[in-house]
Amino acid sequence: MALGHFTMAFPLISELGIGSPESIHALAEPMFFIALGLLILGNGFFKPNISSFVGTFYKQNSELRDRGFNLFYMGINIGAFLAPITCGAIGQDPNLGVNAWHYGFGLAGIGMVLGLLVFMYGLRTGVFKNNGHSPNPKLLNAKIAALRNEKGEYVGGGMTLKTATYVGTFLLIPVIFFLLSFGSKPLLYPWGKELSFLDIILFSMVGYMIYYLSRYGKTITKAGYDKLKVIMLLFFYSALFWTFFELAGSAITVYTETNVNKTVPYLGELSSSQFMGVNPLYIILLVPVFNYIWKYLKRKKIEPSAPMKFAIGTILLGLGFFAFPIGGLFADAGMVPMVFLLIAYLLHTLGELCLSPVGLSLVTKLAPKQIVGFVMGFWFLSSSLAHLLGKFIAQETDAGDLSPVEALETFNGVFTNVGLMVNHNIDN
């Protein structure tokens, strides 16, 4: 991921006097897609494995597991809070000109390197002890490509499954480059909505992984298969939640830019990207509160089950969307007071804390040990599916050249319908 961020900052070489503006411009687009490929692959290694890694520090039925994942989630959001107020502020700084965002990407790369150094320090000093090792190291180190003798035995050097995984990963970069370059073009128009080749791949992948987990479940105990069924069911529930929650990065950000009074006394006007730091700031402040609440309810033997926490979280998410049309009642020339945006983010964050860390903990608890990383990857696929579904909603909020008053009417209608839709699905 660090390489990806530094590649995103590629146009900054012009600041060093390297290359002509024409050559840099010609390479900008291919370098951008290569950078995205590196980020995608890095994220694929990082997100499911770091979450699975945290789960290895707790015994199977430890009551500390959920609280540990809450703290882990708080750590994630410390970074999520710093990103928009640093990289976002730099990217929208008019004094940095056309390369402003590239400075932000470079700063993100430096942050990735610092995180890697901290992790390497933990490995070298034994902080992690023996947690996180492969459940089947013999298979991982088995040779899959080498010379054989007359007995069919591998001899000499060769490539292990572990090495092949790393080599194959880098070979995927041109594949991702092609998919990002050409796979996003619309192919189908079902129900008047655009579906690209990438969208079709995502739907196919969801179907394949459900098929694979169902087949795998038949090779283990009935109890283990039942646990996989729970994960698969909650996968779709999670996708529903994130479909609406992730509008924060699209429709809600456009709403913030177009229809929110962003002026703060003594600070001036904030950028819309800086409001992306509100959600992680709430998480940092509220995680200790949630840990106390769940601990208290458990002690009283009335702690909600994981599915019930999911339902509570989704109800809070739906209520958050009603803050937008209510704020519209107090609008002045189409500009809504900032407090209503902050209330919406607060309710969304409360809902997120009822679902996301609970879901991560649940997956590490229920998934078979041999495939916990794979199942965690499947779990994160719900977020990908949500982004795909969310884009159809975001398209309905395209303000275009509308005035703030006209745009506010559009947003109020969409957000009201989203709030009703979320709570209707809860009833079902």
Where are these regions (language model features)?
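Loop-to-transmembrane helix entry
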Residues: 64-71, 189-200, 228, 261-285, ...
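Glycine-rich segments within core transmembrane alpha-helices of 12-TM secondary carriers
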Residues: 66-91, 104-115, 276-283, 378-394
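Interfacial helix-cap and linker-helix signal at transmembrane-aqueous boundaries
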Residues: 11, 16, 86-96, 293-294, ...
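Cytoplasmic membrane-interface "Motif A"-like loop-to-helix N-cap segments
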Residues: 1-3, 296-315
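C-terminal ends and interior cores of transmembrane alpha-helices
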Residues: 1-27, 312-333
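Intracellular loop-helix junctions on the cytosolic face of multi-pass helical membrane proteins
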Residues: 60, 88-253, 257-263, 295-300, ...
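Helical-face signature of the major facilitator-like transporter fold
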Residues: 36-40, 238-242, 344-349
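Intracellular juxtamembrane helix-capping segments at the cytosolic ends
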Residues: 45-59, 353-367
